[in-house]
């Protein structure tokens, strides 16, 4: 499994090839399509820094309150993570309009999605901090079959043609994932909230806000395929392919130069004679 922990992001982990580190860095520098203030629904008269600074303070306060309650045995960890932390984060900080989920049925398969956003276009699986995002649990499965929260979200976006992206979180970690038929090769962006807030990492928070704010996953022209995040992904893939092409041409040029120099060396007269006589071509 490919993992990338870029030094530019201390609390953001890139697993697989969902989005490159460069895309995240470009987002932080406002160098991607759809990064005008109006594209983020920022009111006239306010700047990006003013908005993100306000949301940073709200998130800090919510996280602190969540941490004060998380160890209490008399509270339901599932409800605590949702009500005290994740739903306020998603609605008040990131701007989503969240709807309680219902069990989705596709064919003979059931998907107990906990919440949805953007009129069902973005499924959310939100659970308590005592859930491991990668560990199977009957509450996310079907008829005795266990699923992990991550597995539930991934299987659902793979099966549902109207969805491309999903969000999964247990309150401590949040993952952004996309339709990915290669179930054996996970691909997602993970945010470590504990590290982010304990290290007071505003720069990482700003990147998370620019990446996950509700306008990034909102369908455009009624099509989820045209959302800004999908455009960023495609742009990153195009740039990656061009970089590989340049690398391939560079390697070929280097090999040609190496071969030419080797043949031209004064001690390789015998080799030059064999090449000119066609001896090596017949080997």
Language model: regions and residue ranges:
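Acidic-basic catalytic patches of nuclease active cores, encompassing PD-(D/E)XK
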Residues: 72-101
């Amino acid at each position: 499994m490919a993992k990338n922990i870029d030094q530019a992001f201390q609390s953001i982990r890139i697993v697989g090839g969902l989005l490159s580190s460069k895309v995240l860095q470009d987002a932080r520098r406002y160098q991607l399509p759809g990064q005008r203030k109006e594209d983020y629904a920022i009111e006239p008269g306010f700047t990006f820094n003013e908005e993100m600074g306000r949301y940073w303070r709200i998130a800090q306060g919510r996280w602190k309150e969540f941490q004060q309650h998380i160890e209490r045995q008399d509270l339901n960890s599932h409800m605590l993570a949702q009500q005290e932390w994740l739903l306020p984060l998603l609605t008040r900080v990131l701007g989503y309009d969240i709807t309680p989920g219902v069990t989705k049925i596709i064919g003979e398969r059931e998907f107990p999605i906990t919440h949805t956003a953007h009129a069902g276009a973005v499924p959310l699986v939100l659970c308590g901090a005592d859930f491991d995002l990668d560990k199977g649990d009957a509450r996310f499965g079907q008829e005795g079959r266990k699923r992990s929260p991550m597995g539930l979200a991934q299987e659902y976006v793979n099966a549902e043609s109207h969805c491309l992206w999903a969000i999964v979180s247990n309150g401590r970690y949040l993952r952004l994932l996309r339709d990915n038929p290669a179930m054996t090769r996970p691909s997602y962006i993970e945010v470590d909230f504990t590290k982010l807030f304990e290290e007071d990492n505003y720069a990482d928070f700003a990147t998370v806000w620019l990446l996950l704010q509700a306008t990034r996953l909102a369908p455009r022209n009624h099509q989820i395929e045209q959302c800004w995040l999908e455009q960023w992904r495609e742009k990153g893939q195009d740039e990656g392919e061009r970089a590989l092409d340049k690398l391939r041409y560079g390697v070929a040029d280097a090999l040609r130069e190496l071969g030419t120099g080797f043949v031209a060396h004064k001690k390789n007269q015998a080799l030059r004679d064999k090449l000119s006589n066609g001896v090596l071509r017949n080997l």
